[in-house]
Curated annotation (Swiss-Prot):
Annotated GO biological process: mitochondrial electron transport, NADH to ubiquinone; mitochondrial respiratory chain complex I assembly
Protein EC: 7.1.1.2
InterPro entries, A to Z: ComplexI_Subunit6, NADH_UbQ/plastoQ_OxRdtase_su6
Name of the protein described by the UniProt record: NADH-ubiquinone oxidoreductase chain 6
Subunit-level organization: Core subunit of respiratory chain NADH dehydrogenase (Complex I) which is composed of 45 different subunits.
GO molecular function, one term: NADH dehydrogenase (ubiquinone) activity
Subcellular location: Mitochondrion inner membrane
Source species of the chain: Pan troglodytes (Chimpanzee)
Family: Belongs to the complex I subunit 6 family.
Keywords: Electron transport, Membrane, Mitochondrion, Mitochondrion inner membrane, NAD, Respiratory chain, Translocase, Transmembrane, Transmembrane helix, Transport, Ubiquinone
Lineage, opening ranks: Eukaryota, Metazoa, Chordata, Craniata, Vertebrata
Amino acid sequence: MTYALFLLSVSLVMGFVGFSSKPSPIYGGLVLIVSGVVGCAIILNYGGGYMGLMVFLIYLGGMMVVFGYTTAMAIEEYPEAWGSGVEVLVSVLVGLAMEVGLVLWVKGYDGMVVVVNFNSVGSWMIYEGEGPGLIREDPIGAGALYDYGRWLVVVTGWTLFVGVYIVIEIARGN
């Protein structure tokens, strides 16, 4: 399972490298969609079936629609590929080599180091019981996100509204 997670992590980082060095909008959108699928697979690997499915359905469904329209508007007759420019190909290969080197370096360690320390983890305790119970952590975590992060939901909604308003104004023209 650790090797699968390392493979998914390398795929995710390589997707980001491919997106940042996109030679054509078509390939950038494709790599971003593939990176989203790999991110959903990482969430599923950690046991988050509900959140992985929601991200896959909502995020990737909307992304495919948006990138379908944007690539139709910015279509090129001969799109530039990753191998057409030497600089782009070298940067992708250097990024791949650095990622493989990092994975091999981290694989040599026996244990993992805690990077983040959660000080107030007690306030996130949703259900604490003595006996066995049928309760999933994933939907409860989504409920806690909307409860403790309600300001983030409001800011995200407002940002989406402003983005849609800007797109409508641009599409309307003069």
